[in-house]
């Protein structure tokens, strides 16, 4: 999907966000205090976002301040796919409540089409959205991702320490996976 400010969320603006209305009709508001997103900490960054998204709002809005943040790529599946495109992501994330916040857990597979003494898997029988929609010989569900829906932070965990491909990714990207 093309990036657009209409798909992004601004946080830390000068106005409150509407959360919900109480049974008595009172509007409850709040302000984002998370660390997710990209800080709009200077005019140069605001101009860069205006150019990137083709929108003037970051430059002309009275609501954007140096403390404002832009959160884009908010879809949890798209977010992890951009972060780790070399993994194959299951299309069925599931929500959990962790520390009072909604977080999504996603399964990821390491795969290869080059593994000794193995034969190609028949992918015709796999369900749609399995994340395994390509030719492979080797596949393991070795990685889990946890995406915080409030601030967008993503934590990747290797859950199968015996997977040599996951270990190679961990060596190649030492700061990507959480211990």
Identify the meaning behind each predicted range.
Residues 1-179:
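Soluble extracytoplasmic regions of secretory-pathway and membrane proteins
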């Amino acid at each position: 999907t093309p990036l657009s400010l209409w798909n992004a969320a601004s946080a830390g603006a000068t106005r409150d966000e509407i959360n919900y209305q109480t049974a008595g009709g009172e509007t409850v508001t709040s302000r984002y205090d998370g660390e997710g997103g990209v800080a709009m900490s200077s005019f140069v960054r605001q101009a860069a976002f205006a150019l990137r998204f083709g929108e003037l709002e970051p430059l002309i809005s009275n609501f954007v301040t140096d403390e404002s943040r832009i959160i884009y790529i908010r879809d949890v599946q798209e977010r992890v796919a951009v972060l780790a495109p070399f993994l194959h992501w299951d299309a069925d994330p599931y929500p959990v409540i962790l520390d009072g916040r909604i977080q999504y857990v996603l399964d990821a597979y390491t795969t290869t089409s080059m593994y000794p003494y193995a034969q190609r898997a028949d992918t015709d029988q796999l369900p749609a959205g399995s994340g395994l929609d390509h030719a492979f010989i080797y596949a393991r569900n070795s990685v889990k991702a946890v995406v915080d829906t409030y601030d967008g932070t993503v934590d990747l965990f290797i859950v199968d320490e015996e997977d040599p491909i996951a270990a190679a990714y961990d060596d190649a990207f030492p700061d990507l996976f959480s211990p």
